Amino acid sequence: MSVDYANYTVLMPPTPDNQPSGGAPPAAPSAGGARPGDLPLPPYGSSSSSRLVNRRGGGDDGAKMDRRLSTARVPAPSSNKSLLVRSQTGDFDHNRWLFETKGTYGIGNAYWPQDNVYGDDGGGGAVKMEDLVEKPWKPLSRKVPIPPGILSPYRLLVLVRFVALFLFLVWRVTNPNMDALWLWGISIVCEFWFAFSWLLDQMPKLNPINRAADLAALKEKFESPSPTNPTGRSDLPGLDVFISTADPYKEPTLVTANTLLSILATEYPVEKLFVYISDDGGALLTFESMAEACAFAKVWVPFCRKHSIEPRNPDSYFTQKGDPTKGKKRPDFVKDRRWIKREYDEFKIRVNSLPDLIRRRANALNARERKLARDKQAAGDADALASVKAATWMADGTHWPGTWLDPSPDHAKGDHASIVQVMIKNPHHDVVYGEAGDHPYLDMTDVDMRIPMFAYLSREKRAGYDHNKKAGAMNAMVRASAILSNGPFMLNFDCDHYIYNCQAIREAMCYMLDRGGDRICYIQFPQRFEGIDPSDRYANHNTVFFDGNMRALDGLQGPMYVGTGCLFRRYAIYGFNPPRAIEYRGTYGQTKVPIDPRQGSEAMPGAGGGRSGGGSVGGDHELQALSTAHPDHEAPQKFGKSKMFIESIAVAEYQGRPLQDHPSVLNGRPPGALLMPRPPLDAATVAESVSVISCWYEDNTEWGQRVGWIYGSVTEDVVTGYRMHNRGWRSVYCITRRDAFRGTAPINLTDRLHQVLRWATGSVEIFFSKNNAVLASRRLKFLQRMAYLNVGIYPFTSLFLIMYCLLPALSLFSGQFIVATLDPTFLSYLLLITITLMLLCLLEVKWSGIGLEEWWRNEQFWVIGGTSAHLAAVLQGLLKVVAGIEISFTLTAKAAAEDDDDPFAELYLIKWTSLFIPPLAVIGINIIALVVGVSRTVYAEIPQYSKLLGGGFFSFWVLAHYYPFAKGLMGRRGRTPTIVYVWAGLISITVSLLWITISPPDDSVAQGGIDV
């Protein structure tokens, strides 16, 4: 049984038995003596706590005794998840805080003084216990290292496997198979690449860590009464939340509305939360669906606050299994839930009926316009009827400025005006409690009735402009939100991802606002999914990546940005360098060198107006240096010509700083700087937000090049995160005990392969661009560079993987093998490499918390995707780079599911795509090869079954990886589309004829084989 030990620092007070030797007893402190709050704060991790006790009347240095007590805690349960559970917020351990700052008698070390004081028993100058608990000194987060009993063997096994691979490859090179040099050569090339690929993937995993956030400390520091905040008003910074959508028919508006409701109801100060949705399609359906969601939010949000509902996505809440009354204490919960459920059902009906309602409204109003035009034409206006267009109308009887149902110039999906509509205005700065009688059915007494601000955005699109897809939409939201709210932090969501844990944002803030948090550019949350089949056939959960690779990167420079569920520092998105940036010099970046803050920094606009919401911009030496190095007149060249936007940059940087509550906190802001109410929005501000999302605003600026989301790749998220890491920023991986966010993932085989194809295509684009990690700056750590290099290289493994998957079949066809004989040395190396791989897998499962089945599913889909989507991505990328030809892979056939009520009906849909051809070929060739090999052995004059061992075993191993693919092609109850049989037959006939042509059968076939 393992026992964890926590160190305490115990400081002995000046008692009669604890006096300095050879000195007079110290005088008792007077009533007017210095109190703890009047003394300078000690730095973390120093002996300042000892000096503090001494200055309180403990005598000279001889009066201090520093002792450590080791107290054993109850060991955590033995399971894969024990490490994760222990590292989360609910089990935050303040022992380390006590050790790092000032563990004293009053905080539970040795004993609790009966009179609750230090020093004299009744002196007026005694220091009270309350004075010792000074909240600014408590850290908001901490690292939880992986136990050495797991990590040390893991690293040792990596070294052992590396040595084994090296010796194996040396042996393979020095022992060629002279009877089949072509087979030996192909296998050698593949094995060298696999070893290189394994190193790129494995080396960044050498330092995984866990983290823990302290929500209680966050509340105590930012939302509790203090001398600078007497009323306990929230001093947290503002947060802008972005939702992205593009097509209301591909991304159902009801799903988007539920995402919006979960965000509006999250636990964050209402006056500090601002929500935006970017509708890149400019659809009236999305606009009116959001308006319906805002109306429903007026009852849903207070209901969630009153009864502490979780999750706060109404669709997920009402469909989850289990007893809804569990943990609910209010007697009116059942009545309230029944009423709100009925309201939600009516809300769904209204949202689902909107397409028909909008169509009928448009038809009616267009008919009216045509009638009026005919009347004018009859009165003599010949062009009246020709000028009438089939418009789409809003509910107030005006033309919709976005995309019309029947597209026309200035009203098409790629050609429409900017739209900004603030649907929910800034809430009141003070809490607005409900009262009895405010609602006819719900008692909202003492419930905060305010709802966060919400705005609908649709950027301008015009023909002839490159709108840069999602990256362009995100940059438009960044600019508009800077004008309207200017939250120093931004959180982005896809429209199908919602907040599952209403405390998740607060946990992220613990890292951003902790000491040193000003160097963190973003907090990435793991992606969790709902609606996945229980067996996770196509590895949709992807836990090996999210719980393994990303957790390991957190121990380096931080996880990559992988899309939805990421909280950004606005200042970092603007392309600025981090404070106190360092370079990693030397062969492996082992030397850290601080750099001049002016070096390579961006323009720092001067502080000015902007919508700051309280507080002023600090003027420390670093910001002055930035401003001096890059005058303000350069800012429009980078950020555009909006003066209001440029003035907001310095305000956002200042508000995003940690509190300057300790000498060790550099580049901080004073407590209480963000307590002032925000000014209300006015027409000029909204007009400016419309201007900054126009299609011409980015002309002659650095948006998409160095500022904002980076253009030029379909995986703009990875490139954007890479650019920030390359400037020296750090990121943090935030795994919460309860999933922070949840979303949906494609469970259909074709959709899953096309998703992987898009990711792999983006990686190939990264490899052939200036974002290749080989060209990274010295601010990127060596192992972090390897991780980003692997991102650009991994699709190319498909070229070697498909050859290696065909090697067993070629061995069975030819009667040869990759080695001349099954030498004991070869088998020993193979056994050692396999055993070390299995042991590494077991230890990785231990420190990451993933399951063995999840690991195996990931391995299977790596082979499936590697021989289909990755291969297509490499082909697509090479054709684009070399010949400038762009190709696409489309769906050509679809088999309908039988049971529409089955939640996993999509799993059984078979939509034919050309991506199926390579895996089908590998499966067909290996099956035929097994038949040929078995037949050759069975019908030989002298059967030698041992000759099947090499090729037969590896061929079976390849087929085992393709089992989920084959099962997916069978559909439900074996209803496989005809096209699958056609391709399988074509492949079989082609392979058979090809082999007969190359190696016609003769009487000597029976003598073929490998020597054992």
From Swiss-Prot:
It is a multi-pass membrane protein. Residues 20-37 have a biased composition (Low complexity). The keyword Glycosyltransferase applies. It comes from the Eukaryota. The keyword Magnesium does not apply. Its main location: Golgi. Residues 606-618 have a biased composition (Gly residues). Residues 1-81, 597-620 are annotated as: Disordered. The active site is at D280, D717. Residues 57-69 have a biased composition (Basic and acidic residues). GO terms for biological process: cell wall organization; cellulose biosynthetic process; plant-type primary cell wall biogenesis. Pfam families: Cellulose_synt. Keywords: Cell wall biogenesis/degradation, Glycosyltransferase, Golgi apparatus, Membrane, Transferase, Transmembrane, Transmembrane helix. It is found in: Golgi apparatus membrane. GO terms for molecular function: cellulose synthase (UDP-forming) activity. GO terms for cellular component: Golgi membrane; plasma membrane. Its EC number is 2.4.1.-. The chain crosses the membrane at residues 150-170, 180-200, 799-819, 825-845, 871-891, 914-934, 948-968, 978-998. Belongs to the glycosyltransferase 2 family. Plant cellulose synthase-like D subfamily. This is Cellulose synthase-like protein D5. It comes from Oryza sativa subsp. japonica (Rice). The gene is CSLD5.
